[in-house]
Design a protein with these regions (language model features):
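Short, compositionally biased low-complexity segments
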Residues: 5-11, 48-56, 83-94
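Non-transmembrane, amphipathic alpha-helical segments
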Residues: 22, 66, 102-105
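Short, charged/polar N-terminal "headpieces" of proteins
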Residues: 1-51, 121-132
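C-terminal charged interaction modules
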Residues: 75-132
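Structured domain cores in non-transmembrane regions
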Residues: 32-76
Length: 132
């Protein structure tokens, strides 16, 4: 079975109509990312979900709770989420996002794409349950 991907089209604002492809990380990489995120959350004093809530509990708090993690620890985690996104220029070939040349003009869309990446990795947990 191949890794999942998803196309996201931005609606409205300065990035209206821009398309991005979200790619799933390989299992070992996402496991390592999740462990570092969990440790960063716990280290920042975030109340990590009870063991009986499992990954669904973590999914409920992880993305919003990253705001409690010191910048030095959160930034690499957030950057790794953006590394899963490719920009599809109009009529062009998908390529890694370059935030320095304006692939994304509205910073809120950077956060939207990060959340889309996170959700792609936990969608199997959402079968009948929602982390939001």
């Amino acid at each position: 079975m191949s890794l999942k991907s998803k196309t996201v089209t931005i609606e409205g604002g300065r990035d209206n109509g821009k398309k991005f492809i979200i790619h799933e990380m390989p299992a070992a990489k996402v496991d390592e990312w999740a462990m570092r995120a969990l440790m960063a959350l716990a280290g920042a004093g975030v109340d990590v979900p009870e063991a009986n809530e499992g990954m669904m509990g973590l999914a409920k708090v992880a993305f919003s709770a990253l705001g409690n993690v010191p910048y030095e620890k959160a930034r690499p985690l957030l950057n790794e989420l953006i590394d899963c996104v490719e920009y599809v220029p109009s009529g062009g070939t998908p390529r890694p996002i370059d935030l320095n040349i304006g692939d994304i003009e509205d910073f809120t869309n950077i956060w939207k794409l990060r959340k889309e990446v996170f959700n792609l990795h936990i969608d199997f947990l959402q079968q009948g349950n929602s982390p939001n």
